[in-house]
C-alpha cells in the first residue's frame, strides 16, 4: 500500500520528494495526497485558463483584423461617378468643316450627346464660333477674328478639306443656339469661351445674355481655359454646368484646381493619368478628355473613370460608350450633366 501511494504521488507531482518509508499513520499520507492533488488541480486550472485566454486573445485579434479589413475596403472604395459617360463631338466632327452648322448636324446624326464649339468675340461684339484667332489655317486668308465684324467673317468661305463634303462659313453663337432650341431632341452644346487679350469680360457678358435669351442653360455646358470666364458664368448661374479646361502646354495642374467652383474638368489627352482620375473621382469631379481619336483608348479611358469623351469621331465614341454601358451597369449620382437622377 505504501509503495502504491508513493508511485501515485510520484506521478501526480514528480517534483516532490517523498519519504522512502511510508508513514504508518494513514492520515498523514492522505493529507499529503490531498495537498498534492490540490496543487496539481490548481496548476491544471491555471494552465487551461491561460490557454483559453490566449485563444480568446487570438480570436479577438482575428475579429479585429477582419473588422479592420472590411473598414479599409469600404473606406477605399471610390465614390460613384457623377454621371454616365457622354459623347462630345470636338468642334462638331471631322466629317465637315469644324465649328460650322453642318459639322454639328453631322455630329448629331452620329449620336453625339453634345457638340463642342469655340466662341470668340468679333470686332462688333458678336460671339462667333471659330477656334483660331486668325483665319489662315481655315480659309487661307490672313484675317484676324477680333478685327473683323461678324458679317465680314460670315462672308469668308471655309473650303472643304479632309473628310468635309461641303464648304463652310463661320456661324454666330446665336445661330447655333437657335438650332438647338428648335428641337428638344437635338444635342446640346459644350461652349468653350476663348477670350483674346483683355476681352474676357465682354465675351462672358455676351454669352450670358444670349443663353439667357434662349433659355438654354440646362441644355448647354460651358468651359474655358480662362478662369475669369469660368467664374463669371458660374457666379451668374450656379445651376449651369461649367468646367475648367486644362491643356498640357500650360504645365502640371495646379493643386489649387480642386478648390475651383467648377462642375467638371476637361484635360488634354496627354495629361490623363490614373492618379488624376483617382483624384478627380475622390473629389466627385467629372473628368472629360480631349481629343480622343482611337477606339481602344476611348474604352480604356471609360474604364479609368472618364465620363466625357471629346472626339473628332463621335460615331466611334458612340459605339464604344454604348458597348461599355451595356456591360457596366454602375449607379450614377446624376442622370446626365446637371440633371438629377
Protein language model regions, located:
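Metal-dependent phosphodiesterase/phospholipase catalytic core, i.e.
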Residues: 131-241, 283
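Hydrophobic membrane-insertion alpha-helices, especially the h-region
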Residues: 57-72
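Ser/Thr/Pro/Gly-rich low-complexity linker/stalk segments immediately outside membranes or between
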Residues: 74-95
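Conserved, mostly hydrophobic/aromatic
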Residues: 90, 107, 118, 153, ...
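Structural preference for beta-strand elements that scaffold enzyme active sites
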Residues: 86-88, 114, 186-190, 219-222, ...
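C-terminal active-site rim and adjoining tail of enzyme catalytic domains
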Residues: 40-53, 58, 243-341
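Catalytic domains of carbohydrate-active enzymes, especially glycoside hydrolases
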Residues: 103-121, 258-265
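Juxtamembrane transition segments at transmembrane-helix termini in multipass membrane proteins
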Residues: 1-52
Amino acid at each position: 500500500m505504501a509503495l502504491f501511494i508513493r508511485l501515485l504521488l510520484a506521478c501526480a507531482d514528480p517534483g516532490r520528494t517523498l519519504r522512502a518509508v511510508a508513514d504508518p499513520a494513514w492520515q498523514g499520507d492522505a493529507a499529503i495526497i490531498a495537498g498534492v492533488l490540490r496543487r496539481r488541480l490548481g496548476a491544471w486550472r491555471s494552465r487551461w485558463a491561460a490557454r483559453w485566454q490566449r485563444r480568446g486573445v487570438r480570436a479577438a485579434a482575428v475579429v479585429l483584423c477582419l473588422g479592420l479589413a472590411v473598414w479599409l475596403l469600404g473606406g477605399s472604395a471610390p465614390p460613384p461617378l457623377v454621371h454616365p459617360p457622354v459623347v462630345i463631338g470636338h468642334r462638331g466632327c471631322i466629317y465637315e468643316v469644324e465649328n460650322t452648322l453642318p459639322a454639328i448636324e453631322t455630329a448629331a446624326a452620329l449620336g453625339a450627346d453634345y457638340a463642342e464649339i469655340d466662341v470668340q468675340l468679333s470686332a462688333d461684339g458678336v460671339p462667333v464660333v471659330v477656334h483660331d484667332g486668325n483665319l489662315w489655317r481655315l480659309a487661307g486668308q490672313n484675317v484676324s477674328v477680333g478685327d473683323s465684324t461678324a458679317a465680314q467673317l460670315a462672308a469668308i468661305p471655309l473650303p472643304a478639306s479632309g473628310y468635309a463634303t461641303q464648304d463652310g462659313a463661320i456661324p454666330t453663337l446665336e445661330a447655333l443656339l437657335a438650332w438647338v432650341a428648335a428641337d428638344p431632341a437635338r444635342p446640346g452644346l459644350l461652349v468653350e469661351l476663348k477670350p483674346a487679350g483683355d476681352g474676357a469680360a465682354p465675351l462672358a457678358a455676351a454669352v450670358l445674355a444670349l443663353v439667357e435669351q434662349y433659355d438654354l442653360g440646362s441644355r448647354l455646358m460651358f468651359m474655358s481655359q480662362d478662369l475669369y470666364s469660368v467664374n463669371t458664368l458660374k457666379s451668374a448661374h450656379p445651376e449651369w454646368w461649367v468646367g475648367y479646361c486644362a491643356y498640357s502646354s500650360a504645365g502640371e495642374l495646379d493643386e489649387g484646381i480642386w478648390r475651383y467652383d467648377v462642375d467638371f474638368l476637361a484635360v488634354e489627352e496627354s495629361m490623363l493619368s490614373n492618379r488624376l482620375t483617382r483624384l478627380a473621382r475622390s473629389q466627385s469631379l467629372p473628368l472629360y478628355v480631349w481629343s480622343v481619336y482611337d477606339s481602344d483608348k476611348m474604352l480604356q479611358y471609360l474604364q479609368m473613370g472618364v465620363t466625357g469623351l471629346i472626339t473628332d469621331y463621335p460615331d466611334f465614341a458612340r459605339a464604344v460608350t454604348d458597348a461599355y454601358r451595356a456591360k457596366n451597369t454602375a449607379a450614377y449620382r446624376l442622370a446626365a450633366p446637371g440633371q438629377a437622377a
